[in-house]
């Protein structure tokens, strides 16, 4: 078939239009990213309230600052309950300081969403995350997850005598030899307490108190107590802390009780009043990227919702564990009850 000169010119023009259109489409996301970065640089920083361990939160901050020069991360790390308390006290004083808030108490996000204190924002790629890591309304997403376990010092206790179930730690032989973290400080432990109340009732904690466990604050703290041998058995704590200690050569062994382990998904969200909203969006995209989700798995031993994250061979997969899950709305409604009853039984 022969083409006339006019047909040839028309075909060339069409090809050129399609090429230019394709280039414009591919350039649009890059241009938008450049515009966001420039806007974030004008803001200068992002303020992050987080319950993530300080070494890891500072590492994430440095990685972000390296990736995006000109935008600093101001890290404020403390326990989940303290974060919420500080945020609410600041708002009462009309102080709007925090951009991105991350705690280990999913119930906090029910409250914050009800009070319209969260910005609806969907980080890039989270559509692929597991359902349990996503708010159906798009206000918050699970940055990380852990499970609560029992752990013991293998130099003080043999594997044969170590507790294997949650009720095993109620045996009087463990009196004065246990350590527990506190739900008044830790969101991880608040979730743990409610999960075991569902499983065994408040009588479980009344009986546990009779064994006089040492009280510490964070879900991270029992690990050091067990590793030192000061108290040889932890009745709770994030599995990742014990895993880290064991990898460093400490005499720590982890027990995943057969009745199930409480799963704690720790959300992250941008506040609706964020003073640095562009930096907050940029930072949120960054922490939910595969690269940073992998950092959390590698450096902290944490679980994440990202489907491409790889885990060490010696870590059980979430799908292989019997998980005890708590409804965030119930956790929020019963938060004060959890803290009050715990103090009633343990005295502090």
Residue ranges and their predicted role:
Residues 118-125, 138-141, 167, 244-262, ...:
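Short beta-strand->loop
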Residues 107-111, 232-251, 300-301:
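A ligand-binding cleft/hinge motif common to bilobed small-molecule-binding domains
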Residues 13-26:
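Bacterial N-terminal signal peptides
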Residues 31-47, 65-66, 171-176:
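Immediate post-signal peptide segment of exported/extracytoplasmic ligand-binding proteins
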């Amino acid at each position: 078939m022969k083409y006339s000169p006019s047909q040839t010119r028309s075909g060339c023009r069409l090809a050129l239009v399609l090429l230019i259109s394709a280039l414009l489409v591919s350039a649009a996301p890059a241009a938008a990213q450049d515009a966001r970065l420039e806007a974030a640089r004008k803001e200068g920083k992002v303020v992050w309230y987080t319950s993530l361990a300080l070494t890891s939160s500072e590492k994430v901050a440095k990685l972000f600052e390296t990736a995006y020069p000109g935008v600093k991360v101001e890290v404020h790390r403390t326990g989940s309950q303290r974060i919420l308390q500080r945020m609410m006290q600041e708002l009462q004083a009309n102080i709007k300081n925090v951009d991105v808030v991350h705690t280990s108490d999913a119930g906090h996000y029910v409250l914050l969403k009800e009070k319209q204190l969260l910005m609806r924002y969907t980080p890039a790629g989270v559509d692929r995350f597991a359902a349990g890591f996503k708010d159906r309304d798009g206000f918050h997403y699970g940055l990380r997850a852990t499970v609560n376990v029992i752990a013991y010092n293998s130099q003080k206790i043999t594997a044969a005598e170590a507790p294997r179930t949650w009720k095993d730690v109620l045996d009087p032989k463990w009196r004065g030899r246990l350590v527990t973290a506190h739900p008044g400080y830790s969101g991880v432990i608040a979730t743990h307490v409610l999960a075991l109340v569902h499983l065994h009732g408040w009588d479980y904690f009344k009986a546990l108190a009779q064994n006089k466990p040492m009280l510490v604050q964070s879900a991270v703290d029992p690990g050091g107590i067990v590793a030192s041998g000061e108290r040889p058995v932890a009745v709770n704590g994030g599995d990742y802390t014990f895993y880290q200690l064991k990898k460093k050569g400490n005499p720590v062994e982890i027990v995943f009780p057969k009745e199930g382990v409480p799963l704690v998904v720790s959300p992250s969200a941008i506040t609706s009043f964020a003073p640095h909203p562009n930096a907050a969006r940029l930072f949120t995209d960054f922490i939910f990227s595969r690269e940073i989700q992998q950092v959390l798995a590698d450096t902290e031993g944490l679980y994440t919702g990202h489907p491409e994250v790889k885990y060490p061979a010696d870590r059980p997969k979430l799908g292989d564990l019997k998980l005890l899950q708590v409804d965030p709305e119930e956790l929020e409604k019963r938060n004060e009850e959890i803290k009050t009853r715990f103090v009633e039984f343990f005295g502090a």
